[in-house]
């Protein structure tokens, strides 16, 4: 029987998957494999940014600030996550982001779809989306 429980530490596990802990990209049979949702533990140094906007977005996302100061740029709106627990939810919206201070952010996206990854050179040092 395939193990249905996985116990880990987000900070320790995140580097192996560019921050992504759960999603379609985890191996079949791994309890962290899901076609329904993706979860990322993103650690951003100060001034980390993705200036390139995600375009053609069809997924939904929730970004939750654990620590730091993190700005999400959305069409016609800039959202600052400044206090622990601040979050933003958006559906099918193009976006970019900027870590104004060293920040830790949890990103939840749904559904988990292949084909959205940007190369690290296009994506800053640690992409949220």
Task: Describe each region flagged by the PLM.
Residues 58-71, 75:
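Glycine- and acidic-residue-biased ligand/ion/polar-headgroup-sensing regions
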Residues 69, 94-96, 104:
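Structural motif
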Residues 76-94:
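Short acidic-glycine-tyrosine-enriched beta hairpin
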Residues 32-33, 50-57, 74, 80, ...:
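Short histidine-centered beta-strand/loop micro-motifs
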């Amino acid at each position: 029987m395939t193990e249905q429980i996985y116990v880990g530490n987000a900070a320790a596990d995140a580097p192996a998957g560019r921050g992504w802990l759960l999603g379609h990209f985890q191996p079949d049979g791994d309890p962290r494999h899901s076609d329904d949702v993706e979860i990322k533990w993103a650690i951003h140094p100060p001034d980390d940014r993705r200036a390139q906007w995600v375009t053609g977005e069809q997924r939904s996302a929730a970004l939750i600030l654990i620590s730091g100061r993190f700005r999400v740029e959305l069409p016609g709106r800039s959202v600052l996550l400044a206090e622990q627990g601040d979050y933003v939810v958006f559906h099918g919206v193009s976006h970019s982001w900027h870590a104004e201070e060293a920040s830790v952010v949890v990103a939840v996206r749904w559904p988990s779809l292949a084909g959205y990854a940007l190369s690290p050179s296009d994506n800053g040092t640690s992409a949220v989306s």
